[in-house]
């Protein structure tokens, strides 16, 4: 990868804010790197939980966010405020919730060909896992909408087998 000169991230955000749109609102900052480095803006409308085979680094630049996680079978909210950073351990299911006007930086390690990311959904009434899909992520910007579309178009996958609650697509 050729050397890329330093750039002002705040200026980049100001000039590219329109790219940080729902449902995920992320924009890859560097191509051909060993890391996936993304600017991510709110609001987002995610109900999925991501399972990353390696750690994820979060740095909240503007506004606050809540990282919903599943830890030891319990749903746990991790608030990350402007100026704060957080290192999420590998394989912890997580769902970033970003309000309007928020912007963060997320860094992940590129996956090897043998590694798969997971995306799961949990019943909003009882917490039971509704569905899990594992995929080899090549292009997160194009693959996430496809994964979400498959889940939300399936009534069977959105219906809880424990309590019968049906998850609706995010607004």
Regions found by a protein language model. Give the residues of each.
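Jelly-roll (double-stranded beta-helix
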Residues: 1-59, 64-85, 93-171
